[in-house]
């Protein structure tokens, strides 16, 4: 699209999967699954969250400034241990379900057109935008393994991406089934961390809760260290080293610590407007990259498509802002305008038609430019 846009979008991607949402969420997920079940009903949960997140981010900062064997150890031992424990938990739940999925009454949002709210809920995984941000890391790793041919690199990235996608899809599907079946045992949970804790406690008892807390905390710690490191390195490079890696790492860690103390449910709620803004351009960019060979990656097509996508995504973002913010910014009129003129706006997909129109306009401009020299000759 352009160098300036590339810098802007890269910053937005890394901030979203970094200090704004993903890093704080790692700390709150660890707290929700590991510490909350141990607290009494009258315990000052907010105080315990403050203390836990302070210790959590102290470790994050320490190891982000001293990257070494700890992250390798966590990656090679703790992550596989968590996956093994998760597989045992899911198998136990599937073999003794709390209720049949068909017997569970869906919540209001999923009683009709379940696909659309589920699609938007999928934004919360941040998988697509993380793929854009860290795809270059995968390529660098493959090159360090001695693969220099671009076609071979593309083939390796594709095969590893397909395998990763298939495994992630399997994990998501199994988690959805187990979560639905658990409605026969528990009331609807406020967030997934609470649900996972309840399921682990029911099927595996106190030992299961301890293992879950241990493995998730260390897995989230490794993820946070990796995210702080990646964000700090990226922003240090973008500022040409004028602001050091150390300064960025400290800034991102302190900011993440502050955000984490609003709690997991609040982080999820406040992340929705940002994800509604950033996901449509991310999806459009991915699709354009796949289709680029058909228009020689013409910059005009990219710019036109991105223009249409961003223009509509802003309305989707407005719609999902908290009601007090909408009222303070007097957004009723623009939201009503979008609802009246953008198809699928009520499904949070109002950006689709503008993106298609932008793509068509870009292709038309490209075609007219190619025809003009021929006509003159």
Where are these regions (language model features)?
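Hydrophobic transmembrane alpha-helices that form the core helical bundles
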Residues: 6-40, 220-236
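A generic transmembrane alpha-helix motif of multi-pass inner-membrane proteins
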Residues: 96, 298, 304-377
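Membrane-water interface regions at transmembrane-helix termini and the short interhelical loops
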Residues: 55-78, 144-147, 257-270, 286-296
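Hydrophobic, small-residue-rich membrane helices and short re-entrant helix-turn-helix hairpins
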Residues: 66-77, 115-118, 138-167, 185-197, ...
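Membrane-interface loop-to-helix entry segments
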Residues: 64-93, 272-283, 302-312
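Select transmembrane alpha-helical segments in multipass membrane proteins
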Residues: 4-17, 50-54, 113-121, 202-219, ...
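TM-loop-TM module centered on a large, flexible mid-protein loop between adjacent transmembrane helices
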Residues: 1, 171-221, 228, 273
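Hydrophobic, membrane-embedded alpha-helices of multi-pass small-molecule transporters
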Residues: 15-19, 92-99, 108-178, 208-223, ...
């Amino acid at each position: 699209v352009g160098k300036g846009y590339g810098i802007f979008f890269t910053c937005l991607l890394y901030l979203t999967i970094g200090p704004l949402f993903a890093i704080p969420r790692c700390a709150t997920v660890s707290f929700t699954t590991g510490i909350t079940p141990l607290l009494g009903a009258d315990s000052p949960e907010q105080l315990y969250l403050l203390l836990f997140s302070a210790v959590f981010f102290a470790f994050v900062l320490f190891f982000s400034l001293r990257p070494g064997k700890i992250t390798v150890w966590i990656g090679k031992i703790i992550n596989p241990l968590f996956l093994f424990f998760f597989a045992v938990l899911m198998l136990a739940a599937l073999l003794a379900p709390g209720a049949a999925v068909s017997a569970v009454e869906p919540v209001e949002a999923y009683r009709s057109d379940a696909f659309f709210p589920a699609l938007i809920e999928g934004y919360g995984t941040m998988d697509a935008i993380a793929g854009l941000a860290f795809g270059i890391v995968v390529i660098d790793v493959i090159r360090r393994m001695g693969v220099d041919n671009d076609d071979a690199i593309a083939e390796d990235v594709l095969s590893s991406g397909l395998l990763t996608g298939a495994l992630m899809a399997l994990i998501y599907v199994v988690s959805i089934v187990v979560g639905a079946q658990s409605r026969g045992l528990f009331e609807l949970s406020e967030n997934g961390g609470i649900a996972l804790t309840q399921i682990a406690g029911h099927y595996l008892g106190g030992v299961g809760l301890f293992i879950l807390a241990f493995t998730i905390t260390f897995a989230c710690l490794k993820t946070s260290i990796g995210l702080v490191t990646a964000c700090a390195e990226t922003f240090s490079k973008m500022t040409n080293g004028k602001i050091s890696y150390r300064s960025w790492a400290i800034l991102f860690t302190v900011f993440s610590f502050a955000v984490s103390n609003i709690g997991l449910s609040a982080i999820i709620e406040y992340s929705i407007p940002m994800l509604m803004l950033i996901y449509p351009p991310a999806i459009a960019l991915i699709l354009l990259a796949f289709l680029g060979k058909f228009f020689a990656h013409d910059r005009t097509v990219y710019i036109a498509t991105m223009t249409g996508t961003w223009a509509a995504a802003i309305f989707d973002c407005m719609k999902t802002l908290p009601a007090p913010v909408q009222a303070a910014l007097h957004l009723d009129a623009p939201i009503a305008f979008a609802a009246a003129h953008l198809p699928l706006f009520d499904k949070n997909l109002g950006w689709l038609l503008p993106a298609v129109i932008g793509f068509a306009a870009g292709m038309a401009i490209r075609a007219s430019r190619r025809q003009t020299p021929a006509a003159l000759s």
